[in-house]
Every structure is written in C-alpha cells, then in structure tokens.
From Swiss-Prot:
SUPFAM superfamilies for this protein: GntR ligand-binding domain-like (SSF48008), Winged helix' DNA-binding domain (SSF46785)
Official protein name in the record: Fatty acid metabolism regulator protein
Biological processes, Gene Ontology terms: fatty acid metabolic process; regulation of fatty acid metabolic process
Residue ranges crossing the lipid bilayer per the database entry: none
Keyword Transcription assigned: yes
GO molecular function list: DNA binding; DNA-binding transcription factor activity; fatty-acyl-CoA binding
Keywords: Activator, Cytoplasm, DNA-binding, Fatty acid metabolism, Lipid metabolism, Repressor, Transcription, Transcription regulation
One GO term describing the cellular component: cytoplasm
Length: 239
C-alpha cells in the first residue's frame, strides 16, 4: 500500500479506505476498536474519531452509539462523491468507471436538456451561448463542457439533475482536461453546442434525444481512441 497523504488525518483516511477496498477491513465486518486502530495507523484517537465520522458521512462506515463500527458495502451506501477515490484506488478499472460515468451523463442529459428547452428555453440558450467566447485549449473546454451540462440540468427546473452533475464534477473535469486536448474533440463539442442552440431556438424538442445520443457515440469513439494514452495519474492527485 502506497499512501501519499500529507496530514495525519489524510493518512488515516487513505489507510482505512484502501483497507476496505483491499478487503483487509471487509464489507460487513466490524472495524477494529478505536484504540487498536489508532495505534495501528499511528494517529491520535481524536484524529481517528474525526476521520471515522467523515468516512461514515461518505458511506464507507456505519457508526452507532454504543456499538462497534461496521464496514459498509460502499457500492450500496456511498454517493457520487467517491468517484475520484474509486478511480485512484484501482487504475485498471478506470476505463470502465469512465465509460459508466459518460453513459450516465448521456442517458440523463437526454431527459433534462429536453425539459430545459421546453420549460426554460431562454435560460437554456443563455447557458449554451457561453460556448461562443471559448478559448481554444483543453482546460477551458473541460470547464465549459461541465458548466454547459450542469447549467442545462438546473435549467430543467429539477435541481436534482443539477446535484447529480455536481457529484460528477471531480472525475468529469479530469477526464475533460485529457479528452479536450484533442482538437477533434473540441470541434465536435462546439458543433454539438451549436446544434443544441438551434434546436432550442426553433423549438424542435423531438430532436434532442437523437442529437445527444449521437454526440455520446461520437465523443465516445474519440475517447476510446485516446484511452491507450490515458495518463496514470488521471484521478490520483488532488483528492
């Protein structure tokens, strides 16, 4: 186990998460007692207690007063906020994790984009217009793309869609900085934003589904061609 965290709390958090991931602390089992665990990791019990509370909030553990702390099956109890952690823990599963993330984005955005165009077209067009003054480099496009999907999610009038996109932000923007380094990807995205603006302006709501699905397929093809050059630290740093 290689842990790069800087602070004692950060080290303890990484140690426990990696131990859960590697089944040293297996899901469904009881975590070692506080005193034993603090000595094992090399942190104070106060620090450990803070870390355990944080991990419980993220769904890794269940803490009940007067009972031992239980290790959860995090797939069933955690939220989108652990995406980056999962990518950092298991490099081999990163491509599949990213495919799943992008598939979810495509599937839910066909719904919220159409709803935004129907319910709040002016707001949707305002969001899409931000693409008109974009600088032609990867970082700018990664931010723009995230903000467009997020903006359209909130423009749908259902803030839950926006919260889902918020939960994807960390890993999504890391992918974007790599993906949008490709000029073909930037060109495809601009064409997509322009087409969406056209659809919204002309009220052609029935075209949203196929337009979004096609963009998902086309961008997916570019991404898969690029994956062999995927940097190993895509989601490792900046935890």
């Amino acid at each position: 186990m290689v842990i790069k965290a800087q602070s004692p709390a950060g080290f303890a958090e990484e140690y426990i998460i990696e131990s859960i991931w590697n089944n040293r602390f297996a899901p469904g089992t009881i975590l070692p007692a506080e005193r034993e665990l603090s000595e094992l990791i090399g942190v104070t019990r106060t620090t450990l207690r803070e870390v355990l509370q944080r991990l419980a909030r993220d769904g890794w553990l269940t803490i009940q007063h007067g009972k031992p702390t239980k290790v959860n099956n995090f797939w069933e109890t955690s939220g989108l906020n652990i995406l980056e952690t999962l990518a950092r823990l298991d490099h081999e599963s990163v491509p599949q994790l990213i495919d799943n993330l992008l598939s979810v984005r495509t599937n839910i955005s066909t719904i919220f984009i159409r709803t935004a165009f129907r319910q709040h077209p002016d707001k949707a067009l305002e969001v899409l217009a931000t693409a008109n003054a974009i600088e032609d480099h990867a970082d700018a496009f990664a931010t723009l793309d995230y903000n467009i999907f997020r903006g359209l999610a909130f423009a749908s009038g259902n803030p839950i869609y926006g919260l889902i996109i918020n939960g994807m932000k960390g890993l999504y923007t890391r992918i974007g900085r790599h993906y949008f380094a490709n000029p073909e990807a930037r060109s495809l995205a601009l064409g997509f934003y322009h087409k969406l603006s056209e659809i919204c302006s002309e009220g052609m709501h029935d075209q949203v589904y196929e337009t979004v699905r096609r963009y998902g397929r086309d961008s997916g093809e570019i991404w898969h061609r690029m994956q062999k050059n995927l940097p190993g630290d895509l989601a490792i740093h900046g935890h």
